[in-house]
Amino acid sequence: YTEMNTKLIGREKEALKLEQCLNSQRSEFVAVYGRRRVGKTFLVRSVCNDSFAFYVTGMYNASKQEQLINFAAAFQRCFKTEEIKVESSWILAFNSLARRLEQLPEGRKIIFIDELPWMDKAKSGFIPALENFWNSWAALRDDVKLIVCGSATSWMISNLINSKGGLHGRLTHRVLVEPFSLYDCERYFTHFG
């Protein structure tokens, strides 16, 4: 638990677990989940020091096409490409992401997908594409840190943690972020006044 994360009051165990994943010598697939407004995104951004190779946040109540446009805009922002290229499917979007990540210098590549459940629309092909991205590319490397986050706890549990499909047993770590205890609330308000 590093000095730069001392602002994470009440999240010491969660921060330590994320740091261990970031510093491991293998690819990691981490699910961070818990109720809305408990600090999941802040935790990930703080521990990772905002040093993401790719970072996208799913859009609430958006269509598959809108989600793909959002993914393409994040791609352009992260990789500073000239134009936004919107892929027609999630398979193609994740393939483009893998190709671009392969062009980066050696070293860990942190991919943060926030509000992941919002990206999975009925018949969108999102989960099979994510499975393919992890199983056929990221898991075969030793430098990918795929961190997914979501407030839809039941979705995270059924589709990732207890997955019966292609992601069965693929998560390397899961981090449950719970609301502050009274003790942590007291520490927080004492520290930040």
Region spans (language model):
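Phosphate-binding site recognition
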Residues: 1-193
